[in-house]
Amino acid sequence: MMKAEGIPGIEQFASPGKGRGLRVSRAYGVGELLFSCPAYSYVLSVGERGLICEQCFTRKKGLAKCGKCKKAFYCNANCQKKNWPMHKLECQAMCAFGENWRPSETVRLVARIIARLKAQKERSPSEILLLLGEMEAHLEDMDNEKREMTEAHIAGLHQFYSKHLDFPDHQALLTLFSQVHCNGFTVEDEELSNLGLAIFPDIALLNHSCSPNVIVTYRGINAEVRAVKDISPGQEIYTSYIDLLYPTADRLERLRDMYYFSCDCKECTTKSMDVVKMSVRKRSDEIGEKEIKDMVRYARNSMENFRRAKQDKSPTELLEMCELSIDKMSTVFDDSNVYILHMMYQAMGICLFTEDYEGAVRYGEKVIKPFTVLYPAYSMNVASMFLKLGRLYIALDRKLAGIDAFQKALTIMEVVHGKDHTYVTELKQEMRDF
């Protein structure tokens, strides 16, 4: 049995008011790697099939497909062989169910975790500090809606995997799905596109702060923890669990809903950025508190309505929704208000999808400057925005603007991904090609 030997420079400790946490035993500078953790289990998003290797998450052309289901793609025979213990859970089922094979990403990940747990004889390299079974589940905090969703996931697991997997009892499944809900990571690329879902037990020990001193990024199927501030010996390390663009009330609501806790970091107690994030238009008539409150309610409803509409509305209808809400919000909010920025960012995404590059640039240019003010210094949200803009400028033959945007993205990426990361070397190559 592999013992919990620890990670050099990192200590687990009882963090006051937060339960378990991690702190450093030596100093770390900005951009320095604190530690990395291989995924315990992971699954590639269906939308990325054919573009990324199912085993190592390398993006490349000319991947070889599985001869049986023709739906899984690999770098080579070696990757395919390594992935078989997991792919065999799905290969025959995909052939049998055909178009009706539709388990959620969460269900697919849990199936793989169950298979891994069954085959596992000793502590894995993903569990140097924390065993998978020791992760928080928060079963007692689940409301009826979450419980129903979990029951639906369990039904999906039985429907799609019962032929190839022996399941633990119902209570154990409830716990496992809850653990994945609270501790699962969305693996993202340099443009923050969703590549898949994974579980990293050791990374789950990181507590949250809205003013984080580390960031979690990905190198293939490994998660890496890098410093985004200078960290002194004895300091706790914090990452952010959520998008930090929004004002304090919104962040706290999201943390309570998703992770069952409230944050008391400096940013949440001082609310120092809220005035800037909620900037109001300068008008000849005074804008009253009620008008602002009503518009905040409208903005939050618009965001939720848009999120739901993405499932079934056409790009044209979605863009119209964005434009209508931006116009209405603009009567009260300034263009740098986070609710307007949110809808502009969505509008940019639709323009990219429909290949309206001029439209995408128009929205992107409105968003990028406020982003650099409202997000922390080394933010993937800012880097990915500069990257997208850079690629749009190049496509529109605006090379100087493209190189400038790439350079700004690179400054952030070298810190959050590391100077030797493929994303960084590929971007440098892209810049040299011009």
Swiss-Prot record:
Location relative to the cell: Cytoplasm, Cytosol; Nucleus
A biological process term (GO) from this entry: negative regulation of cell population proliferation
Catalytic activity: L-lysyl(4)-[histone H3] + 3 S-adenosyl-L-methionine = N(6),N(6),N(6)-trimethyl-L-lysyl(4)-[histone H3] + 3 S-adenosyl-L-homocysteine + 3 H(+); L-lysyl-[protein] + S-adenosyl-L-methionine = N(6)-methyl-L-lysyl-[protein] + S-adenosyl-L-homocysteine + H(+)
PROSITE patterns in UniProt: SET, ZF_MYND_1, ZF_MYND_2
Enzyme class: transferase
Annotated binding of Zn(2+) 2, by residue: 66, 69, 87, 91
UniProt name for this protein: N-lysine methyltransferase SMYD2-B
